[in-house]
């Protein structure tokens, strides 16, 4: 799985720019604010249909441009394919694969990416939302139905939250509360099943990677956490649904009093431990960074197991945040697939990986 060629027209600070990539490692270097991350963002969008930096499509359209276009020649599942994303202000984005219209959730059938940026180094110490986002981004690429369930859940959650906040001023809103509670339980049940399965696989893949780096003295653990009333997160969606309904009904008064949704998949988390101790509370910065690296590299292995191909790995200015030992650990494990690395200086990365070098300056790629 790889991108051979990309055209960027009116995208961010790229007017009309093209780039050819090596099937292995590609080192993209240049000073800050020149467009390196914009280039990685365009590749991310080809797989996800959205950005990892903004929710607003209008921000992709370059100054003075009416539209932005990303056009790429990719090789996936043994086939050459063309992926195109067209963005216009005020108009829904257009996505096509080989000129056939696609939804954002369908892009994962053609292209997969794993993004690793400096914020991910804090994955262990951040709140649960960061770890849910990790699960959501990964699962939605290999299980398109998951993205549909996630979209449904978010709509039910937002609607119910508004009711819980405003019902005192508009008591009639409570007439629809049960409808949204039911929808939350149904979509949550599906998300919980997918997440529990993914978390188990992530734990199996990450532990040996972590052990390889840290030695046998440290054991990485990953456990999935969800609503306490869910007896078995790997059970059928129907069983989980009933557990959630019971929990939600028991907390109905508390939800009305607090104005918050107290039951559902938005309560999920991944509990990361090192030698049995909660890493968020007790691990050092070095330990949490090693754990985060192991988790991201494990995510890559899961894609390989699922699709038979490595996803495209995007390392956005992350190597500069790592010491030499951790840099080598990452670089030694990225073989077998295509990798795009951004950095301010090449610093011998291309020599150590045998990769292609691209220089970015003022929105030009050379």
Where do the model's predicted regions map?
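Structural recognition of the conserved hydrophobic beta-strand(s) that form the central parallel beta-sheet
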Residues: 72, 338-345
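Conserved NTPase motor "head" modules and their coupling/switch loops across ABC/AAA+ ATPases, GTPases
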Residues: 1-31, 171-312, 321-325, 329-332, ...
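Conserved beta-strand scaffold positions in the cores of enzyme catalytic domains, especially
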Residues: 113-115, 339, 357-359
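Conserved P-loop NTP-binding catalytic core
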Residues: 11, 15-96, 145, 153, ...
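Short regulatory helix/loop adjacent to the ATP-binding pocket of P-loop NTPases
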Residues: 137, 347-360
